Amino acid sequence: YCDWSSDVCSSDLDLFAHQTNVDLQNHCICFNTVKLGKSMQSIGMMTVLDQIWNRITRNRVLGRRTWIFTDEFQLLLGNSACTNYYFELSSRARKWGAILTSITQHVRSVLNNEDARRMLSDCGYIKLLNQAPDDANDIARLLHISDEEKRYIENAEVGSGLLIADKVVVPFNNTFPQDTELFHLMDTNPNRKK
C-alpha cells in the first residue's frame, strides 16, 4: 500500500510541494519537463497542463488571447491521462480564446493515437514537411490530400512541404540562404553548429 499524497508531499517525489520558481505572471512562460525522471513525468505534465488551462481561463476573463506552443507533442501521447487532458483542452481552447500549436517530428505517434488523429483532422492550419512514404500515405488519407499534393511531402527538400489552411492545400518552398547570420541563428542541424 502506498499513500500517494504523502509520497508527493514529503518524499523524494516532493518536487511539487514547494513554491515554483516559474513566474506565472509573466506574459511568456516556458515549461520544460525534460529533466523530470520517469516517475515524475505524468504528474509534471499534468501540472503544466493544469497551469495552461488556468492561464486560458484567466485570460478569457481579461479578454486576452492565449497562445500555447507544445513542442515534442508526441511525449504527451505516451500517457493516457495527459492525452485525454490535452484533447479536452484542444476541444475547448478556441472557444475560450486560445490558439493551440502542437509540434512534432514524430508524426507516426500522432497517427497511431486516435485522440491525436482527431485533433489533427480538426486543425484549421497544418504545416507538413518531409514525411516517410507510409506516413505520407496515412496523412493523405486522413486529411484528404491528393496524390499530386502528397508528392510535396514525400522526399521533400529541407524547408519545403505543404500548408493546409481551412482545407486549402498550398505547396511551399521556404529555403533560407545559408550564408546569412539569421540562418545560423535558426539552424537546428547539429552538424552545422560551430
Task: Indicate residue ranges for each PLM-predicted region.
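Single conserved hydrophobic/aromatic residue that forms the stacking wall/gate
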Residues: 1-8
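Short, solvent-exposed coil/turn segments
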Residues: 3, 24-26, 63, 121, ...
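GHKL/Histidine-kinase-like ATPase module
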Residues: 11-21, 26-28, 160-161, 171
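Short coil/turn segments at secondary-structure boundaries
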Residues: 14-22, 62, 152-156, 167
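Conserved P-loop NTPase motor cores
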Residues: 34-152, 178
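Conserved P-loop NTPase
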Residues: 143-193
